[in-house]
Amino acid sequence: YETEKNNGAGYFLEHLAFKGTKNRPGNALEKHLSSVSRVYEEDAVPGLTPCRNALVSHLDGTTPVCEDIGRRIPLAEWESRYFYDQCPAVAGYGPIEQLPDYNRIRSGMFWLRF
């Protein structure tokens, strides 16, 4: 239902985009705008379209992306698996009077697990 309050240009465009007119279906405006933006992108950034096409052609769908996400190891698990109880390498440059003792640093590696 239409009143004077909602009879603006925005309402008209929304009505045109979603409901269409007698001569054009509801998605005609969307298709036209996407074709215009596609032509603009091809003219403005000539290397973008071949790059995008190459990227899309390498994706076989969502399966590889989901598999990659599923195979990631959480950082806490990774560091506890590989860094726990390892001997650290300590290097000092310049005066080393304030550098803690190596055994103290090594014993502190236990606390990095938690």
Curated annotation (Swiss-Prot):
Membrane topology: Peripheral membrane protein
Similarity comment text for this entry: Belongs to the peptidase M16 family. UQCRC1/QCR1 subfamily.
Location in or out of the cell: Mitochondrion inner membrane
Superkingdom, natural source: Eukaryota
Organism taxonomic ancestry: Eukaryota, Metazoa, Chordata, Craniata, Vertebrata
Function per UniProt: Component of the ubiquinol-cytochrome c oxidoreductase, a multisubunit transmembrane complex that is part of the mitochondrial electron transport chain which drives oxidative phosphorylation.
Annotated organism of origin: Mesocricetus auratus (Golden hamster)
Subunit structure as annotated in this protein's UniProt entry: Component of the ubiquinol-cytochrome c oxidoreductase (cytochrome b-c1 complex, complex III, CIII), a multisubunit enzyme composed of 11 subunits. The complex is composed of 3 respiratory subunits cytochrome b, cytochrome c1 and Rieske protein UQCRFS1, 2 core protein subunits UQCRC1/QCR1 and UQCRC2/QCR2, and 6 low-molecular weight protein subunits UQCRH/QCR6, UQCRB/QCR7, UQCRQ/QCR8, UQCR10/QCR9, UQCR11/QCR10 and subunit 9, the cleavage product of Rieske protein UQCRFS1.
GO CC aspect terms: mitochondrial inner membrane
Record key words, sorted: Acetylation, Electron transport, Membrane, Mitochondrion, Mitochondrion inner membrane, Respiratory chain, Transport
Keyword Kinase: no
Protein's name according to its UniProt entry: Cytochrome b-c1 complex subunit 1, mitochondrial
A GO molecular-function descriptor: metal ion binding
Annotated InterPro entries: Metalloenz_LuxS/M16, Pept_M16_N
Modified residues (N6-acetyllysine): 31
